[in-house]
Amino acid sequence: MAEIKSKVTLIGAMLARPGLEFIYEGELPACEQCKVRKACNNLKVGRKYRVLSIRATVHGCSVHLNGACAVEIVESPMVGLIKADLAIANSRILPDLSCTQSECKSYPLCHPDGVVSGERYMVSEVLGNAPDHCDKGRSLKLVELLPI
């Protein structure tokens, strides 16, 4: 399996702690005039990231009260449900996010935070069967997904 590359970005100093996971939502209008905005906005919208380490560098920021802190991050794996026939370790898949049964107990795992529609992922690990029944009657497996 390929090694996951880390990168450096900036997040709010009050949020910066190892292990923090977050989903990057995009650039804010308040960032337009900032000198370091490219360092803050060097991530992909909708992707889930995990902080590995914190650097001493802190920059003034109009968005974050105590400034923005430099952190080393990696893309974080997501746990979700996929069709059982696609649940093969190290396979590359395009998750099916078309289900609209929002009242189904499995819905949050069928639409995990950080999975972007139309993007491919690698099944890094098959974790087992779905914890709840699918309202559509589909056979699902719980897996760990990594962005490709």
From Swiss-Prot:
TM region(s), chain numbering: none
Source organism superkingdom: Archaea
Pfam families reported in the protein's UniProt record: UPF0179 (PF03684)
Record InterPro entries: UPF0179
Coiled-coil intervals, chain numbering: none
Similarity field: Belongs to the UPF0179 family.
UniProt protein name: UPF0179 protein Mpal_0949
Organism: Methanosphaerula palustris (strain ATCC BAA-1556 / DSM 19958 / E1-9c)
